[in-house]
Amino acid sequence: MATPLIRYLFLLCFTVCASIAMAQDGFGEETRIPEPVNPGLNYLLSLAEPVHSQNFDTGVIEEVIKFVLSSKDKTALYFPGNRTDIPSAYHEFDIHNGLKHVLDIGFNPNIPPFILSPSSIRLAYWKEINGKKQLLPDLSSMLSRLDQPITVTGVEHEEITPDLNTGAYYGYDLNRTLILLKYQGRPALISISKQKNISDIGKKGVVLGKDDNWDYFYSGQNGLNKPGLGWVNSYMYDSYTVSIFIERGGPGTLVHCGVFKWLRAGWADINMVQNQHIYRGLQRYTDTVKGILEYPSLPEPDKMAEIFSMIKTFSADELKEKVRNYITLLSQKYGDDASSGGKLITESIKDSTYLSQLSQYQMQSVLAVEYIKYLMGKNTIQDVAYFISPANINRHPKG
């Protein structure tokens, strides 16, 4: 058996090689975000703490908003320098739709919050809102009454999809704050999150085929899904995110989004994350969010919500049966492809305890993602027929 030192050197070599590969993969020069932006970022991050002032001060974040809206070197990798002990990155993008559409789909009390980012988030759900077990308020309906900023705080549980580099996936709780406001007459949403504690131990996952297929497998087994690294007990130690969505141009025509992300993760309290890793993850997130929010044929949000509500009515036994069908379809599609983790899927299908280890939320999320894949043209009516009848599909057609 390898000694701890040999294991550490092996893991360090793997991380360095991965970083070199990323450096050769089109990432530009790393550029620190201007110092005047830091006080505003620190202020926003403080709002994700369990105890903070409820009086939001727009003036403190002026420099943050200016930076988000400013023109930038498109070849540079920007990163905030306000926390020197943790890697970070910044990424921005445009959504060719209004903020109301963003809220209707991504921050809807009746639509799962991970639906905007199925390539990054396996599942997410609010454990509490404003100190109570309750639904997220209907933020979209509040856009017409933004005389004062509206603040929502709570605790959200999140589990991510397998990492593109290691195959690991993690679950953790977040303190999250949402602020809906008008900034210089423009409607804006600020989402702030801070990881509460160290994550669950990292588990082996698989990205099946191309990442934009949104096909992932979650083994439930501890470790990294990399040759020689299955023994690694990895964790996400810290993560913070500030996302700013602000309308630009004519009302309802375009939303500009800037995302600041900090992340520390690794093994034995040794951080293995670099700025490039975070930036690549933000690009992954961006591609999916834009693709969904700009897709021309989505049903109306209330029609989508009806299908998600139906999924919640399935009993535990019904969910297990439907997820069993899903895994069988995955096995048929990828089981012979060793590079896509077909062996891991086949082993799990033979394990009679596999379905029992899945939580209700995890099984519901499988069906929810399959539905959004159908809406986006990534699978067919036949692919979702095991949990949505043709009659239901016909009652909720694409737009």
Regions found by a protein language model. Give the residues of each.
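Bacterial N-terminal signal peptides
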Residues: 8-18
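Terminal "cap-and-tail" regions of soluble proteins that handle hydrophobic small molecules
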Residues: 24-399
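N-terminal secretory signal peptides that target proteins for export/translocation
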Residues: 1-6
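Sec/Tat signal peptide C-region and signal peptidase I cleavage site
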Residues: 19-23
